[in-house]
Amino acid sequence: RLCLSDYSIFSETIEICPEGHNYCFKKFPKGITRLPWVIRGCAATCPKPEAQVYVDCCARDKCNR
């Protein structure tokens, strides 16, 4: 799986996920959708949502844009 570890309208950084990490995710505080508060990466399971933190989890290459 290929996931984004960083993304902007100008560039993106791709991370090759280790074996067994089949999900891409992004998470950020609710109400703030811009960097530097967005965290992206690979995961073996979808991260659990936290209070006041939005989590988006997907299972396609580079789907955590």
Swiss-Prot record:
Species, as recorded: Hemachatus haemachatus
Main location: secreted
Tissue: Expressed by the venom gland.
Classification via PROSITE patterns: SNAKE_TOXIN
Family named by the database record: Belongs to the three-finger toxin family. Short-chain subfamily. Orphan group I sub-subfamily.
Protein name: Ringhalexin
One GO biological process term: venom-mediated suppression of blood coagulation
UniProt keyword Secreted present: yes
Gene3D superfamilies noted in UniProt: CD59
GO molecular function annotations of the record: toxin activity
Protein's job: Has anticoagulant activity, since it is able to inhibit the activation of coagulation factor X (F10) by coagulation factor VIIa (F7) (IC(50)=123.8 nM). Also shows weak irreversible neurotoxicity.
InterPro entries linked: Snake_3FTx, Snake_toxin-like_sf, Snake_toxin_con_site, Toxin_cobra-type
Superkingdom field: Eukaryota
Annotated transmembrane regions: none
Compartments, as annotated in UniProt: Secreted
A cellular component term, taken from the record's GO annotations: extracellular region
Annotated S-S bridges: C3-C24, C17-C42, C46-C57, C58-C63
Pfam families: Toxin_cobra-type (PF21947)
Key words of the record: Blood coagulation cascade inhibiting toxin, Disulfide bond, Hemostasis impairing toxin, Neurotoxin, Secreted, Toxin
